């Protein structure tokens, strides 16, 4: 077929509503023209007498599918009877069962990998389940080919575990949905499209990349799409139409184009975490010092909230069974560990469970703040997952605060000659400059100092670019755009401040050095009190 795109329809669980499905397909084709293929995931057959009678009309030839239809094998014991073979076969005219697992390659070169059924939890495996051997038999021949780049389409009955990581959230909480074996399969096969069913949910995840930025060659992106059940009462989407040119027929430059909303691969972290969990399963005594002991009188109107979080007795503490990873301990006095006597507590604005916000000492502006972990972590890439999650909440809340004041938030971190993470959050008045002006100022001044400041995709996980221990400087703009520089030597410690204080941004060059901006303790207390009051409507920690 050359470079002519194939027109494909994908469908969720049919559950025996075959007439309803094909009536819908006929209507689509009447309106939009003929499609080449229909792919069905989840349970195709139903177990009711009505469903059996409906199928009989297609099996006998009294009715015919209006399009070449490929379905997965059984995903429940009740429907095994409809499949004469686990190896795949034609069940009726225009309806083909692909089988338990394998690769289907069409005349056009379109490559479809598939795994039918649910993950087996017993031996011998029931006929509607797949085993680790099935996964190995599918993956091994493909990965042994040095020219393997991925498959065009992956069809699975079950969801991959952790697919929502880094992505948009589905309509219902699917955090513990799916299985790790399918996640591992998707990570290895790198499908351009991955369809799954069984959950009765429609979810189109943001596309994710299959390479590590700045460390691996650019590869094509993957899209995961879960589809609902045919004719579901909530009218959730169960059919998905798309055009696809087989990978083997595509120009490599076109194939690896990255959409703007691409995210990190959701499965790499899952695999790493899985290994860590297995390695540390016996470590039950490591427990992070609870943040509930850190309560200061921050001059709030309601003294019982004590900065805003309820005091929790040992018996009242939620998630008491959780034992988060203990952060590294400082080797000496630390000015930023919240439990440390060195902390200037009058500067604290808000305290969460794992992070806190404090007024910057000698700030660029009166509302310049620091976002910091309560425990001793050196950089963003060192943070435990629960700390990262709360740090993101603080970033989001402070951005909303800035927007309400007619300002845009610029975040930057210098992981160089510092022992405790300080994420600088600086509000820049919108009338002063645009986001593009700020970006250009950073790029220009970096170039002047012979530093290669690189723009990286908005959803990039810094851990993949800068492993723990790597000195770096990074900026995050209000649009989500990020700039990154791997520090080599002689990095100017005030670089972030100098750029924001420059004529091109806020035009306050005299404030580029924090030591020149120090004020009395009394003035600091007044500033902190004002920021605390202004920020209060956005402080999620007050509700915890």
Curated annotation (Swiss-Prot):
Q: Name one Pfam family in it.
A: CwfJ_C_2
CDD domains, alphabetized: MPP_CWF19_N
Coiled-coil annotated spans:
none
What residue spans carry the Basic and acidic residues bias annotation? 266-279, 521-535
Summarize what gene deletion causes.
Morpholino knockdown of the protein causes reduced swim speed and abnormal touch-evoked escape response. Morphants exhibit abnormal cerebellar structure.
GO molecular function terms here?
A: RNA lariat debranching enzyme activator activity
Q: Which family does it belong to?
A: Belongs to the CWF19 family.
PANTHER family, sorted: CWF19, CELL CYCLE CONTROL PROTEIN, CWF19-LIKE PROTEIN 1
The protein in question is named CWF19-like protein 1
In which organism is this protein found?
Danio rerio
- What lineage does the source organism belong to? Eukaryota, Metazoa, Chordata, Craniata, Vertebrata
Instruction: Tell me the name of the encoding gene.
Output: cwf19l1
């Amino acid at each position: 077929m050359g470079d002519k795109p194939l027109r494909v329809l994908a469908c969720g669980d049919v559950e025996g509503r075959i007439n309803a499905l094909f009536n819908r397909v006929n209507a689509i084709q009447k309106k939009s023209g003929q499609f080449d293929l229909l792919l069905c995931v989840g349970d195709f057959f139903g177990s009711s007498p009505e469903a059996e009678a409906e199928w009989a009309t297609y099996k006998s030839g009294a009715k015919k599918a209006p399009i070449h239809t490929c379905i997965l094998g059984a995903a429940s014991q009740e429907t095994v009877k409809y499949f004469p073979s686990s190896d795949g076969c034609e069940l009726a005219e225009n309806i083909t069962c692909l089988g338990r697992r394998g690769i289907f390659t069409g005349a056009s070169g379109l490559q479809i990998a598939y795994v039918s059924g649910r993950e087996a939890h017993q031996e011998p495996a029931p006929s509607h389940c797949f085993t680790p051997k099935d996964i190995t038999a599918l993956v091994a021949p493909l990965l042994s080919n040095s020219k393997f780049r991925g498959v065009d389409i992956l069809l699975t009955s079950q969801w991959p575990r952790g697919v929502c990581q880094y992505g948009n959230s589905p309509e219902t909480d699917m955090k513990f949905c799916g299985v790790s074996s399918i996640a591992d399969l998707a990570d290895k096969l790198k499908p351009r499209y991955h369809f799954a069913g069984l959950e009765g949910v429609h979810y189109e995840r943001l596309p994710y990349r299959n390479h590590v930025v700045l460390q691996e060659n650019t590869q094509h992106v993957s899209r995961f799409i879960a589809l609902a059940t045919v004719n579901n009462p909530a009218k959730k989407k169960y059919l998905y139409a798309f055009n696809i040119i087989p990978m083997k027929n595509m120009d490599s430059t076109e194939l690896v184009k990255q959409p703007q909303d691409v995210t990190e691969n959701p499965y790499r972290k899952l695999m790493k975490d899985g290994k860590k969990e297995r390695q540390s399963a016996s470590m039950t005594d490591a427990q992070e010092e609870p943040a509930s002991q850190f309560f200061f009188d921050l001059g709030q109107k309601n003294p019982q909230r004590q900065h805003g979080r309820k005091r929790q007795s040992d018996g009242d503490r939620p998630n008491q069974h959780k034992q988060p990873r203990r952060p590294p301990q400082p080797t000496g006095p630390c000015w930023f560990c919240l439990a440390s006597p060195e902390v200037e507590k009058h500067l604290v604005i808000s305290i969460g469970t794992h992070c806190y916000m404090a007024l910057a000492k000698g700030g660029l502006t009166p509302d310049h703040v620091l976002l910091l972990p309560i425990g001793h972590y050196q950089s963003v890439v060192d943070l435990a997952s629960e700390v990262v999650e709360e740090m993101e909440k603080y970033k989001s809340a402070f951005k909303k605060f800035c927007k309400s004041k007619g300002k845009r938030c610029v975040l930057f971190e210098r992981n160089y000659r510092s022992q405790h993470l300080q994420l600088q959050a600086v509000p820049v008045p919108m009338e002063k400059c645009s986001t593009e002006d700020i970006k250009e100022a950073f790029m220009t001044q970096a170039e002047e100092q012979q530093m290669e400041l690189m723009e990286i995709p908005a959803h990039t996980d810094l851990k993949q670019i800068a492993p723990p221990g790597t000195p770096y400087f990074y900026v995050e703009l209000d649009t989500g755009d990020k700039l990154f520089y791997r520090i080599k030597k002689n990095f100017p410690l005030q670089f972030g401040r100098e750029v924001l204080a420059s004529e091109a941004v806020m035009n306050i060059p005299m404030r580029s050095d924090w030591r020149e901006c120090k004020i009395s303790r009394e003035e600091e207390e007044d500033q902190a009190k004002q920021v605390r009051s202004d920020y209060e409507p956005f402080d999620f920690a007050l509700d915890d």
